[in-house]
């Protein structure tokens, strides 16, 4: 479990300090990961002009991050279980910070793409570890709920501020600043983590080895699937550029299942996880949540710039209501509701409200005013997302022991990330959305995409009856800090 030096010397005050430090580090890591998923999007035209990208290769500035991130998430989660939170956190953050610096100083398309892949690799370690540090520092109950709520809210702010600051930095500074900004954040956090996180001690469950064959197969399978899905915008589903990586990815994942079930002494995803009621159905709901949340940034950015004619900075500002509403709902409303309402009821209600918001967003036209075209839908979308996020994360991680915390977090983040890539690819393929056409034509295409996202949200609501009925967060929570350091 996560431990801070000196935490075992005192009682509740020290435990509170330990958990608070874990929360700060986890939220910072979560913010950086989500921020860099969205920050580069608005800057792509400037990147293309400065480095001379060919139009067809520009997508790899985004895809290289996504491929490395999705492909290595399971590996990153299990790595933390085996080698300890401190060592893996420092390594992942160091890789992320260094490759951000390299990307900001890139002089060619190849160097920028390689740096973005390095960022994705670092993010694949940080993302599951951010959740693991919370679930191993806070016992199930109100305190864990609040910690997960804060982390979810910070991630949502990271996504919204990525769009906002990406536009502002690109318009008033340079596209390079959207990557270089990670450096002055990452370096002090590295020093803080190195100082306060305790090193590993002997684990009560003995020596555990990393399942390298499983890691290779899972990484290859997820990378190939993500690659195939990401190609569907440029190629048909039956073309070799899509079909070959999809087939290869499915074969690799089939081999992964066989290896894990028959040969692995320490599986990358321990089969016992799927005996927990929230893991199977919960991760399917998380897949749909990713398919709903990730595409909204893409299509709403295009809607504001190409339908309403906003500048990059104005489009970034358009996301501020999303962040503000989600913060209020996540930090104030959800913790109170979870003390009185079942988690799956909140998930169903949030999914229905979010679906209504996305349907409203689909009605956007070139003549829409900001109030009815952006702000109104944003309120419903953000309320829905806020109600779904923390209860679903709690459902997926409920009952997971400390030995499997990293694997469970890695699985949850993998399903969410792959759901985002898959949802975006499906919506792009079905709607034929692009950037060429009149504002009215583009509004129609983007509107179809928002209807598709509403369908994903409704599917989450349909799934809620099979999710476990978790106990309400009424008992007073106790922060749980193990003497076993990571």
From Swiss-Prot:
Protein name per UniProt: Cephamycin export protein CmcT
Function: Involved in cephamycin export.
UniProt GO MF annotations: transmembrane transporter activity
Keyword presence, Cell division: no
Membrane topology field: Multi-pass membrane protein
The organism's place on the tree of life at top rank: Bacteria
One cellular component (GO) term of this entry: plasma membrane
GO terms for biological process, alphabetical: response to antibiotic
Family: Belongs to the major facilitator superfamily.
Residues annotated as transmembrane: 24-44, 56-76, 88-108, 121-141, 153-173, 178-198, 210-230, 241-261, 284-304, 317-337, 345-365, 369-389, 418-438, 450-470
Cross-referenced InterPro entries: MFS (IPR011701), MFS_dom (IPR020846), MFS_trans_sf (IPR036259)
Signal peptide: none
Localization in the cell: Cell membrane
Organism: Amycolatopsis lactamdurans
Keyword annotations of the record: Antibiotic resistance, Cell membrane, Membrane, Transmembrane, Transmembrane helix, Transport
């Amino acid at each position: 479990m996560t431990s801070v030096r000196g935490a075992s010397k005192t009682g509740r005050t020290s435990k509170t300090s330990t958990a608070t430090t874990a929360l700060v580090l986890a939220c910072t890591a979560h913010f950086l990961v989500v921020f860099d998923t969205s920050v580069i999007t608005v800057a792509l035209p400037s990147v293309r002009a400065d480095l001379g990208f060919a139009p067809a290769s520009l997508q790899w500035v985004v895809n290289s991050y996504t491929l490395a991130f999705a492909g290595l998430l399971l590996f990153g989660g299990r790595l933390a279980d085996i080698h300890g939170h401190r060592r893996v956190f420092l390594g992942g953050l160091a890789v992320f910070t260094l490759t951000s610096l390299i990307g900001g100083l890139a002089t060619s398309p190849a160097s920028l793409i390689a740096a973005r892949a390095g960022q994705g690799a670092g993010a694949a370690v940080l993302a599951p570890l951010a959740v693991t540090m919370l679930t191993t520092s806070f016992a199930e109950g109100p305190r864990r709920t609040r910690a997960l709520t804060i982390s979810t809210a910070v991630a949502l702010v990271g996504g919204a501020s990525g769009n906002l600051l990406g536009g502002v930095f690109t318009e008033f500074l340079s596209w390079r600043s959207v990557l270089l900004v990670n450096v002055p954040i990452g370096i002090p956090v590295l020093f803080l983590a190195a100082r306060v996180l305790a090193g590993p001690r002997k684990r009560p469950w003995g020596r555990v080895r990393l399942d390298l064959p499983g890691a290779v197969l899972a990484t290859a399978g997820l990378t190939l699937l993500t690659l195939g899905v990401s190609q569907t915008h440029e190629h048909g589903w039956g073309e070799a550029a899509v079909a070959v990586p999809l087939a290869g990815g499915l074969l690799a994942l089939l081999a992964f299942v066989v290896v894990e079930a028959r040969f692995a002494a320490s599986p990358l995803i321990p089969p016992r996880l799927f005996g927990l009621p929230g893991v199977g159905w919960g991760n399917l709901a998380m897949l749909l949540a990713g398919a709903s949340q990730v595409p909204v940034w893409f299509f709403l950015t295009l809607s504001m710039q190409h339908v309403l004619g906003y500048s990059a900075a104005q489009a970034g500002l358009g996301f501020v209501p999303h962040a503000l509403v989600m913060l209020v709902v996540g930090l104030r409303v959800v913790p109170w509701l979870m003390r009185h309402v079942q988690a799956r009821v909140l998930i169903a209600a949030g999914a229905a409200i979010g679906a209504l918001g996305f349907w409203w967003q689909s009605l956007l036209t070139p003549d829409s005013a900001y109030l009815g075209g952006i702000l109104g839908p944003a309120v419903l979308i953000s309320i829905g997302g806020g109600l779904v996020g923390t209860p679903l994360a709690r459902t997926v991680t409920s009952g997971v022991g400390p030995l499997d915390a990293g694997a469970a977090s890695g699985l949850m983040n993998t399903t969410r990330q792959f759901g985002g890539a898959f949802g975006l690819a499906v919506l792009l393929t079905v709607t034929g959305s692009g950037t060429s056409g009149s504002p009215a034509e583009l509004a129609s295409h983007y509107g179809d995409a928002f209807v598709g996202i509403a369908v994903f949200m409704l599917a989450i609501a349909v799934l809620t009856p099979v999710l476990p009925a978790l106990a309400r967060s009424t008992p007073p929570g106790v922060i749980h800090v193990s003497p076993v350091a990571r």
